[in-house]
Amino acid sequence: MSAVLLFILFFQDWLVQKPKMMRWIRHGFLVYTLFFIGWYALGQLSIVNVLTFVNSLISGFKWETFLIDPIMFVLWAVVAGIVLLWGRAVYCGWLCPFGALQELINEIARKLKVPQYTVPFAWHERLWAIKYIILLVLFGISLESMATAERMAEVEPFKTAITLHFDRTWPFVTYAVLLLVVNIFTRKVYCRYLCPLGAALALPTKLRVFDWLKRRKECGNPCRLCDKECEVQAIHPDGHINYMECHYCLDCQMTYFDDHKCPPLIVKRRGKRRGHNAPGHPEEIPVVQVN
């Protein structure tokens, strides 16, 4: 499946111009991530893995520690390469089993017309800082006691929902289920605001090699369609993409290439019909209703 993901990434500009096929591919990949990588292979990464790695660098690195579980070792190797090339977005959006579970549940909720709540951007900007605070607290605790840090890392519902298939005592199950219930009404609340693993993977994102998500000069002003549609609110009102919060779902890229949906392209298409190629003035950009 690594080859499939690389194909998606390298040919994303072609795939996003076929929205129906792209959505089927994405949903199919998420099902694979949840059922095979997560529930079957138990390949759910955890902040505990990151803390163990950092502590091993401090106390004396030993390969044997990380070769005990080959699946986790291979997955971490793949994720490390992906983070260096594309940032954390690809892991969070495509390879995290709990993230896949949340997204699939939210997709089903939307199909059933469950009302969705959008967190005001001013609040969103402040709430996503919580996961970095959790990361710092866990890191500080791990320097004193790795065992204590591992217990505190139960802020992650991964062990309950993925590794143990919800077969735990009721407090852990209640916590995991509560996060999934909230996710029915607003997508990936845990990922956006509480996940210390996502925070840890976001730190090296600024060093990524590739920057393949396209934007237009009209993005943010006057057009704000993509930031209104972005389910994880990774696109700021000024139009730029915050890669430290992006999950690389490629929805904004499907809009970018769609001349029946992207307002600047709509204006350009109408201009061609009138016999000229000018993209039109910003004030001509049509208003698009966002549901």
Label the predicted regions.
Residues 1-237, 244, 251-291:
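Non-ligating segments of multi-cofactor redox enzymes
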